[in-house]
Amino acid sequence: MAKMKTKSAAAKRFSVTGAGKVKFKKMNLRHILTKKAPKRKRKLRHAGFLSKVELKVVKRKLLPYA
């Protein structure tokens, strides 16, 4: 059986931490920021982590060698 390929789109969007969690950057912080509240923009600066259900799918299907 051939080796599985890592999905390059997923590799660009997700990174795996040392503890095995999958980290990603939150959306909605690129442009049209004037109508967004400062509190919302502040919360969007922090990284997001996948839930356990999503974690299994992403690690198995998209990032097999992570």
Swiss-Prot record:
InterPro entries: Ribosomal_bL35, Ribosomal_bL35-like, Ribosomal_bL35_CS, Ribosomal_bL35_sf. It comes from the Bacteria. GO terms for cellular component: cytosolic large ribosomal subunit. The keyword Manganese does not apply. SUPFAM superfamilies: L35p-like. Keywords: Ribonucleoprotein, Ribosomal protein. One of its GO terms (biological process) is translation. PROSITE patterns: RIBOSOMAL_L35. GO terms for molecular function: structural constituent of ribosome. Belongs to the bacterial ribosomal protein bL35 family. PANTHER family: 54S RIBOSOMAL PROTEIN BL35M (PTHR33343), LARGE RIBOSOMAL SUBUNIT PROTEIN BL35M (PTHR33343:SF1). This is Large ribosomal subunit protein bL35.
